[in-house]
A protein has these predicted regions:
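Conserved, mostly hydrophobic/aromatic
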Residues: 87, 164, 236, 274, ...
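Substrate-binding cleft of secreted/luminal carbohydrate-active enzymes
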Residues: 31-39, 241-243, 265-334
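Chitinase-like catalytic core of GlcNAc-active glycosidases
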Residues: 46-73, 78-82, 86, 90-230
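Short, well-ordered secondary-structure micro-motifs
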Residues: 137, 206-209, 248-249, 284-286, ...
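Alpha-helical structural signal in soluble globular domains
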Residues: 111-118, 153, 182-190, 228, ...
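Glycoside hydrolase catalytic-domain groove-lining segments
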Residues: 105-110, 188, 241-282
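N-terminal Sec-pathway targeting helices
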Residues: 2-26
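C-terminal region of N-terminal signal peptides and the immediate post-cleavage residues
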Residues: 26-50
């Protein structure tokens, strides 16, 4: 995925992490495969459909000059009749010191205006990301970095909010909570929103600690840490993919589990989104034949409790196929 060096580093980090963590997850989860198959059993409630608060992650081509008004019109037509309300447009990546190079998104202000005209009521957020310091290489130091200037920069371009995707953040990291509190103070004062991408929640208590010992990398968060993060933002998007599971039924059951855990941890006044994998890869952590939009939507619907501030988010616009869009429409928009 060509969205800048930082995003490519995140994808490489995921691939390296998969070598051990995905096997640990696979062994753990397959040991409880009966539970996941049980999660996938049953019939979703008829009311488990979009509330009109869904989202779409969008690539960097929208802000660097590669997209035109014709592309905006085509996107508006594609989104018509769906439940998509938020667009996370990749405006970064951030530098490790938190700065955002203005040369990266020269068409940002134009894009926000064009989207507001073409899709009345849409909320356009600036997707900002970077790799966090890890033993495998330098990155952003969450204990010291200040993301307020970069956030001010994108809000000045007209964005309706800031969507942060900083990876990998260990469960319990205090620096990340500090960063969120600082940016949230800014967005709240400006009448904008702060959204954040988060990893999955421990399928078993303490599993994030086991993964950390095995790999020196985080894979899951504790429910308590997810709750603490959610208290500092307006919107949480769970990246409920890259599960290493080999069958659609297992993946659907896993998404059902992750959705239930997120619903329990994220306060009802915070917007909760469950990410759908609208991309296909063949890696140890992602089996494209299993991790489909249709399977993920089924898992979401099975866990849907009727909460008002709840939806799904498709990742990502430039890899989503007509089949992905059809699965979203038929399974969730209905």
């Amino acid at each position: 995925m060509a969205m800048g060096t930082a995003v490519r580093r995140v994808r490489r980090w995921v691939a390296r992490l998969a070598g051990v963590t995905a096997l640990a997850l696979l062994g753990t989860v397959l040991g409880a495969a009966g539970g996941l198959w049980a999660n996938d059993a049953g019939t979703p409630r008829a009311e488990a459909v979009t509330r009109g608060g869904d989202a779409l992650w969008m690539g960097h081509a929208w802000v660097d000059g590669r997209k035109s008004q014709a592309d905006v019109a085509a996107l508006a037509a594609q989104l018509r009749g769906t439940g998509i309300h938020d667009l996370f447009v990749h405006a970064g990546p951030l530098a490790n010191d938190g700065r955002l190079d203005p040369a990266l998104d020269p068409r940002a202000a134009w894009l926000v205006r064009a989207l507001h005209r073409a899709i009345p009521g849409v909320r356009v957020q600036a997707w900002l990301g970077d790799v966090v310091d890890t033993p495998e290489g330098p990155g952003m130091d969450l204990s010291r970095v200040d993301l307020v200037p970069a956030s001010e920069q994108v809000l000045a371009d007209g964005f309706d909010g800031v969507h942060l995707d900083l990876e990998p953040v260990p469960s319990g990291d205090r620096g990340f909570l500090r960063v969120l509190a600082q940016v949230h103070a800014l967005t709240s004062a400006r009448g904008r929103v702060l959204s954040v991408s988060v990893p999955q929640t421990d399928p078993l208590p303490g599993l994030h600690e086991v993964a950390g010992l095995l790999t020196n990398h985080p894979k899951w968060w504790s429910s308590d840490y997810l709750h603490q993060v959610a208290l500092r933002v307006d919107q949480v998007a769970v990246m409920a993919y890259d599960s290493a599971l080999p069958l659609p039924s297992l993946f659907s059951g896993y998404v059902e589990q992750q959705t239930r855990l997120a619903l329990a941890a994220v306060p009802p006044g915070v917007d909760l989104l469950i990410g759908l994998p609208a991309y296909t890869e063949s890696t140890m952590s992602h089996h494209g034949s299993a991790e489909t939009v249709a399977a993920a939507v089924r898992g979401v619907r099975l866990a849907d409790s009727g909460r008002r501030l709840f939806g799904v988010a498709l990742y990502v616009d430039f890899t989503a196929t007509p089949e992905d869009w059809a699965a979203y429409r038929e399974g969730w928009v209905r």
